[in-house]
């Protein structure tokens, strides 16, 4: 049987642009380009898939070659093609070329301006972004969103909210992206009232169930200290996605609830939501705050498993976490295994060395950063260096670095830099010079810098200056309990009990409560916490009995309790009994009781360790042949064989 020509089924003709786009999306670029060559002069839309492919593959050279081909083909002035080119150049980091394309366009539309505004915002050039915005004859909602988001991203919150009000006044209805930005703006301004006003728009425009809007709304409440209100918003969401979980976790971190952060992280994983780099940065920070190394290591392993451990922000958080848990070696290992270079990462490692009193290592790392890398040295690096010098007794080197920061690098010292210099001089006993710097510096003082000097007065027993500094502090904050305690310590050291009584009476009259000293350590995933005179532990009787025997052993080795640090006028026996009850001693005693023989001990204390406990830990490290790491309110102390890493310079 013969078939007629008309009965043969012909293949359907496929539009070249569609065929090329399909091939590009599948990665078949060679076949796509062959199709492209056959139809190169027929349709401008044929170029679009290739431009998008260059953007996706991060191939700027190929994109530029394609741009040249467009010029030769006579399509380089087509506004749609130009928009794609601008987008490509902007996303691939060649923004000047995007601006050049925009400048040569004969006809522009709102998309052209939107791309340019977004590019300027990405480059941090808000002046030119606003110029393009103001010159636009016709603005769409996306244009307003881009400009508002840009202003708020760079913390021009008032300007961003003002632009939102202008937009709304012109009759534009906000969408989820608009409201997400303005909630961030009100969070940045720490204005609950503005945020609550904007909250009304979510209901008015039917966006009360939108995930983006609710996450931003919750962030606004939490950033303003309204943690419960933020949690209510998150719980009302029909679905809790990654952004919502991160908002909840970050909100608790910002409000000083690290234990809740770790609980929420656990619940997030149980829900099946996979963490990202933002999650890891936040939960590692909470591990740092609590100094719980075991959980930090577990989270590190989870970050490795999903490929987030090499992300710069995560590496910096790992360095900080291990450092604050007393594991400087692990922090250095995380730093050495980095895959990318970043100023924040280097500054984190310099800070870690400083926190552990290893000033020489911090300076060496800074010199390597300055001489062997292309990274910019910033004020933060110098701040960490000055801190390292102040905690290592490197007075002259610290002052030299301060001068270098100003004269060689041209940085204007901030209040924190001056505070480090005051600490540097104060610890070295140069109290008059430290006070002179505070009184002559060109910026306004705060309570921290005066407390730093008061602490130095305590170290060097300068009661006259301490009284003078205390008066300055009272003008700033008359309710800071630490300052009263420091002044009382100075008087107690000089056995000026009447002055001590006056300080204590002043605290009672003003209802100033002394912050309780708390010490803790982690063992097998459990945190054991102690406070001064704590008898709430199930083994309190055994702990005090163990401490009594340990104190006798220490005395046989030459230990003499530093009763001068007791702020009460009582007999020596009572003072010694008082010293035994310090939280860090209770913690180290229980750690010695339950940890395996020879295992290192890591203890955290929320306040500065007292001089007696510092001496006692030296003796304990010898008697029990243990390495003891103590993190107090200002630094780390590593006790090995009767010596402390701080060199008694603390």
From Swiss-Prot:
Annotated stretches, region: Type E motif: 449-524
PROSITE patterns: PPR
Gene3D superfamilies noted in UniProt: Tetratricopeptide repeat domain
GO biological process: one example: RNA modification
Region (Type DYW motif): 556-650
Example of a GO MF term: zinc ion binding
Coiled coil regions in record: none
Stated family: Belongs to the PPR family. PCMP-H subfamily.
Protein name according to UniProt: Pentatricopeptide repeat-containing protein At2g41080
Taxonomic lineage from the root: Eukaryota, Viridiplantae, Streptophyta, Embryophyta, Tracheophyta
Gene: PCMP-H29
């Amino acid at each position: 049987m013969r078939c007629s020509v008309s009965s043969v089924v012909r293949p359907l003709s496929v539009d070249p642009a569609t065929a090329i786009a399909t091939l590009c999306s599948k990665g078949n670029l060679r076949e796509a380009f062959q199709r492209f060559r056959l139809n190169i002069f027929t349709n401008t839309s044929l170029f679009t898939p290739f431009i998008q492919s260059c953007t996706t593959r991060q191939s700027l050279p190929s994109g530029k070659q394609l741009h040249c081909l467009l010029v030769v083909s006579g399509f380089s002035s087509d506004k749609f093609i130009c928009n794609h080119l601008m987008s490509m150049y902007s996303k691939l980091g060649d923004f000047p070329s995007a601006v050049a394309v925009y400048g040569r366009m004969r006809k522009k539309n709102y998309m052209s301006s939107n791309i340019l505004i977004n590019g300027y915002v990405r480059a941090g050039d808000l002046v030119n972004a606003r110029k393009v915005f103001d010159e636009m004859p016709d603005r769409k909602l996306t244009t307003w969103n881009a400009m508002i988001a840009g202003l708020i991203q760079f913390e021009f919150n008032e300007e961003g909210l003002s632009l939102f009000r202008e937009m709304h006044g012109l009759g534009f209805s906000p969408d989820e992206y608009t409201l997400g930005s303005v909630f961030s703006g009100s969070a940045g301004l720490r204005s609950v009232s503005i945020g609550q006003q904007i909250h009304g728009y979510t209901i008015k425009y039917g966006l009360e169930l939108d995930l983006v809007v609710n996450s931003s709304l919750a962030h606004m409440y939490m950033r303003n200290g309204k943690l419960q209100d933020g949690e209510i918003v998150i719980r009302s969401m029909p679905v809790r996605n990654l952004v919502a979980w991160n908002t909840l976790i970050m909100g608790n971190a910002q409000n000083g609830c690290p234990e809740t952060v770790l609980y929420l992280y656990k619940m997030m994983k149980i829900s099946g939501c996979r963490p990202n780099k933002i999650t890891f940065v936040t939960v590692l920070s909470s591990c740092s705050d609590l100094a719980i190394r075991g959980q930090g290591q577990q989270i590190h392993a989870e970050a490795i498993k999903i490929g987030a451990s090499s992300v710069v922000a995560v590496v910096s958080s790992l360095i900080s976490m291990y450092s604050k848990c007393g594991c400087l070696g692990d922090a250095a290992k995380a730093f050495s295994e980095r895959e990318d270079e970043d100023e924040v990462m280097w500054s984190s490692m310099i800070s870690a060395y400083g926190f552990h009193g290893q000033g020489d290592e911090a300076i060496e790392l800074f010199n390597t950063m300055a001489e062997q890398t292309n990274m910019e040295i910033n004020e933060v690096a110098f701040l960490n260096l000055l801190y390292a010098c102040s905690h290592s007794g490197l007075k002259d080197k610290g002052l030299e670095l301060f001068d270098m920061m100003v004269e060689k690098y041209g940085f204007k010292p901030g209040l924190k830099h001056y505070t480090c210099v005051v600490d540097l001089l104060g610890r070295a006993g140069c109290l008059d010079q430290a006070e002179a710097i505070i009184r002559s510096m060109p910026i306004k003082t705060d309570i921290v810098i005066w407390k730093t000097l008061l602490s130095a007065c305590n170290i060097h027993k300068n009661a006259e200056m301490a009284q003078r500094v205390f008066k300055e502090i009272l003008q700033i904050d008359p309710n800071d309990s630490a300052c009263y305690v420091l002044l009382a310590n100075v008087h107690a050291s000089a056995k000026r009990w009447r002055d001590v009584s006056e300080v204590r009476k002043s605290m009672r009259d003003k209802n100033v409560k002394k912050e309780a000293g708390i010490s803790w350590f982690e063992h097998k995933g459990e945190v054991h916490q102690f406070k001064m005179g704590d008898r709430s532990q199930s083994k309190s009787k055994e702990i005090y009995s163990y401490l009594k025997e340990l104190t006798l052993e220490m005395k046989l080795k030459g230990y003499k309790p530093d009763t001068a640090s007791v702020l009460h006028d009582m007999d020596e026996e009572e003072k010694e009994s008082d010293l035994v009850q310090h939280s860090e001693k209770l913690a180290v005693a229980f750690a010695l009781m339950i940890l395996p023989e020879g295992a290192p001990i890591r203890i955290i204390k929320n306040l500065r360790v007292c001089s007696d406990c510092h001496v006692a830990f030296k003796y304990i490290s010898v008697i029990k042949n243990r390495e003891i790491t103590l993190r107090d309110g200002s630094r780390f102390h590593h006790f090995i064989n009767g010596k402390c890493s701080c060199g008694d310079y603390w």
